[in-house]
Amino acid sequence: MIQRFQKRDLILYTFMLAILVSIWLAMFQIDRQWHFIAQTQDKIDEQTRDIADLRRQIQRGAVLSGPVSEADSQTLPADWQAFARADDASRAADYARGDWLISSFPSQVPTLTPFLSGDTYSSNVQRWVIDTLITRDPATLEWLPLVAEKWSISDDGLSITFTVREGLVFSDGQPLTAQDVAFSWHFMMDEKIAAPRDRSYYSRITSVESNGRDVTFQFAEPYFESFQIAGLMAILPEHFYGKYLESVATAEEFNRSTGLLLGSGPYRMVSPTDWKPGDLIELVRNERYWGWVSAPFERRIWKSIQVDAAQLTEFKNGGIDVYTARPLEYRDLVQDEAVTSGAQPFEYYDPRGGYIYIAWNQLRSGSATPFADRRVREAMTYLTDRQRIVDEILMGYALVANGPFNPLGKQANPNLVTRQFDVAKAKSLLAEAGYIDRDRDGVVESEQGVPLSFKITYPSGSDNYKRVVLLLKDLYVKAGVLMEPNPVDWPVLITALNNKDFDAISLGWTGDFEIDVYQNMHSSQTEPGGDNFINYKNPELDGLIENARREMNEDLRMPLWHQVHALLWREQPYTYLFRSKSLVFSDRRIQNVKVERAGLNTGGLWSMPMEWYVPSGQQKYSR
């Protein structure tokens, strides 16, 4: 019996061994297959890159013309000067393509679909995917051809014609033509599309028509930013977005979308349709990119990290490559050798960095708020100790703001004196407006006995915002004003803005060397979805803005902007808080990071060829 058991046991073991050998052979075969697939994919990728390089050579006119000397290759044609800086970087001895560039956003991005997104974060992503007709040199600020190879402007300034380059394609391989440029304007201007902000911005354009390779923008009247508006308009592929204009239903499908993003830029979405809020934002190199220089990084990634401390931890752990520090952090981090040995610090005023403000909503749910009274708004500015905010919270890495215009440029009125913290002056203004402490409880009330009490809404997760608002709460109570901090997530905040459902809100506007305040201060922009979300209306201001916008002569335009600044200074629809320095750390493996006149050389708000790269020996995410 024991012998029979041993025989059965031997048969069983033999059978099991045969199965194990079969499994091992299958795994070996599968591994060989995967290895073969990986090799095949590498060859396909290599061929795709070679084809893209060949396409670029054809575009340059360098193919079949014999070898190109090093001296000749370093001189780009005039219409390719937008790529000169990236081309120079690509000639560095240690230049290499590859690696990933990973950044973070302090809020969750609600949508990446063009024209639906009104925030800086989505725009930051879109500019790597969607091209524009022109771009700007970050050092000289000169406008340069990008998708357009040239342009002409009529003598009266009302007509601008761009000539689109030949042979350009979108990331899906379909051709980019002047018709796509014209379509992009018609698409956003269609009332079925939920793009009131962009329609406002492009409202001066009366028509955009294509003719062969030419596309002509016609303006209703002279406008000082006409060239910039036309040249920086996002170019969308008609074959991809056109179907959303077919009916109200398809337009609503577009309006509800969050990830419809396809363009001709140096990067593309992994899928141009599937991204959803909360997903990792991941772009991959567009191997069909038409530019003189291809994108250096294989992937461009943004993580949503909504808590400041968590962002810092992620940066220290190497999870993100570029980190914008808070002032207190920056002061400590630049003295930490463990940080500076692996990351390079940059400290600068970005002219496009804009300003932080508190906006006072003047009409809520159809009723006037206390902030409809100019004296109340001015009192709140006197109660806002902005210099203390700069000194104690921002550690001196900021300037107190007294208006929307860049104090380092010509647009700001140099004769306006910034209001200082003054509780007595604030109390006097509140009393003039009818707010006094009627029952001696330390809180001022209106004539109807209603306390002056409100909430300031601001983005949650930001320690700086939190510290500022908590400081203001303590300062306001000195004059008997009650304020409750109201931190909310970014999507909730955007909804509150669109519905004008807040008392006061603290946010920031991006800036430039010269800006147009029509979008957020003109009475016409109080419409639903418009950026005058505080319902501020002033016919005098409207007229000044309109006159400044149509004045093409800079010497005559600046005095008009000074009048706009003076009126805003008097009216205080916003309490302008401060303009921060950009305090940035960049991983030291990333080369050619520079501070230029326009800020860090990443392109900012413009589509611009990437100049950064990582030498092959230092690449972290190579395949």
Where does each model-flagged region fall?
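Ligand-site clamp/hinge motif
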Residues: 255-256, 287-334, 474, 482-484, ...
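Surface-exposed binding/hinge segments that line
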Residues: 94, 163, 198-247
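N-terminal lobe/hinge region of extracytoplasmic solute-binding protein
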Residues: 85-87, 99-155, 186, 262-266
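A structural "hinge/loop" feature
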Residues: 107-123, 147, 174, 226-236, ...
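Gly/Pro-rich hinge or "lid" segments in bacterial periplasmic/extracellular proteins
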Residues: 124, 131-142, 234-294, 299, ...
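Detector for C-terminal structural segments
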Residues: 15-24, 60-72, 77, 81-85, ...
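Extracellular/periplasmic solute-recognition and catalytic clefts
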Residues: 188, 207, 270-282, 303-367, ...
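Aromatic- and charge-enriched surface segment that lines or borders ligand/interaction sites
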Residues: 43-50, 149-194, 213-218, 311-314, ...
